């Protein structure tokens, strides 16, 4: 009976996600269907910018929650693994025809290979074949980005996973900062382009379908990051709900008891760390696609703290909490509070404080209020289906109480 209920819940969740993805496609193409639609529905509007960034950040936040929330390992190396993913993706997908221009300061690239050209030689570079080549190169590069991040996580995991609590956090944060410095090293310029940005690789706008005249007939630049994020988060959910996930939670709750139960602590910690880093690497590649470039100086410790803040706001140990918190965090910081940065006059009176930067002051106060009133985060350690089921149960109990009173 319980298994049937679980299957129904899982089926309903997949149907809901499919419906949400279709809705996003329709929403992004609303101005094509109805040319007179409000400006907010234009594909270049702030609404879709927020959705793209939220999709990328939600994946990274969930990957961090897998490690911090479900396994109890406090790591601050997320920005470093994102950097590895972003650069792996960019280096593999910059076409050979653009490498001389991108690496002009170094006389060209040392990497004489491009996935786009490799697949283009098989499927073609224009028309339907060109689209297939581009899609395959992106998918393979995303997987490679995750694998490179996971490999480096395995390398540093051997020594650092012996550490606990703050010491592990400091070690992983140091690793991320070292990586950022190395990737800006001029000696590696022919590979990483030094302190300069890598560009000219496929981005989310590359998935927009155009007519022969060059006009866009179907926008998919928001659908694709959401699709990638949904698929990756679904894999993390499956892992958390598996026997491995239960082992992670046992380690988080009590390492001594978990080891007494026969759980191999070192192996499961490494699995969690490597898996989290894999998805952080994929998230880094998606971030590069979002900003249309890869540059090491962007992946600072501040980015890691942002992701950590999102995890705390959503609830440590809640995947749906991380997704909801990401959407709220990005929408507030990038969109809803933008009006606070503009100088405002009421007649001849200038409204005080409203100027560039005031938005972040108010945003910080909002975060403090949320943390004060939601000590365990918005969702705590619960998931959205549990919360909705609880609401339904309470509503049903209230109705039953009213009927009994009558």
Segments predicted by a language model, with ranges:
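Transmembrane alpha-helices and adjacent helix-loop boundaries
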Residues: 1-406
């Amino acid at each position: 009976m319980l298994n049937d209920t679980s299957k129904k819940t899982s089926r309903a969740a997949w149907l809901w996600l499919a419906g949400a993805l279709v809705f996003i496609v329709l929403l992004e193409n609303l101005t094509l269907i109805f040319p007179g639609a409000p400006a907010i529905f234009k594909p270049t509007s702030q609404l879709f910018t927020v959705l793209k960034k939220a999709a990328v950040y939600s994946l990274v936040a969930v990957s961090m929650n897998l490690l911090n929330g479900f396994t109890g390992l406090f790591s601050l190396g997320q920005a470093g693994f994102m950097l590895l993913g972003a650069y792996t993706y960019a280096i593999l997908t910059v076409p050979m025809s653009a490498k001389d221009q991108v690496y002009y300061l170094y006389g060209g690239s040392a990497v004489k290979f491009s996935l786009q050209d490799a697949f283009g030689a098989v499927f073609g570079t224009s028309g339907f074949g060109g689209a297939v080549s581009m899609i395959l190169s992106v998918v393979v590069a995303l997987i490679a980005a995750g694998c490179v991040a996971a490999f480096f996580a395995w390398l540093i995991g051997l020594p650092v996973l012996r550490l606990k609590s703050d010491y592990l956090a400091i070690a992983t944060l140091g690793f991320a900062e070292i990586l950022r410095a190395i990737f800006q090293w001029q000696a590696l310029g022919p590979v990483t382009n030094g302190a300069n940005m890598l560009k000219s690789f496929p981005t989310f706008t590359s998935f927009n379908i155009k007519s022969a005249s060059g006009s866009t007939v179907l926008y998919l630049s928001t659908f694709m990051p959401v699709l990638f994020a949904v698929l990756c988060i679904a894999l993390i959910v499956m892992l958390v709900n598996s026997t491995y996930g239960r082992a992670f939670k046992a380690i988080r709750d009590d390492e001594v008891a978990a080891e007494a139960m026969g759980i191999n602590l070192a192996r499961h910690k490494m699995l969690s760390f490597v898996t989290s880093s894999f998805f952080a690497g994929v998230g880094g590649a998606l971030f590069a696609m979002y900003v249309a470039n890869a540059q090491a100086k962007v992946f600072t410790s501040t980015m890691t703290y942002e992701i950590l803040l999102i995890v705390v706001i959503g609830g440590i140990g809640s995947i749906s909490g991380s997704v909801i918190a990401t959407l709220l965090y990005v929408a507030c910081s990038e969109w809803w509070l933008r009006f606070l940065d503009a100088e405002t006059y009421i007649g001849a009176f200038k409204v005080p404080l409203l100027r560039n930067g005031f938005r972040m002051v108010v945003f910080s106060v909002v975060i403090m209020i949320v943390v004060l009133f939601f000590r365990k985060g918005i969702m705590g350690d619960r998931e959205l289906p549990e919360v909705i089921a609880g609401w339904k149960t309470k509503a049903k109990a209230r109705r039953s109480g009213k009927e009994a009173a009558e």
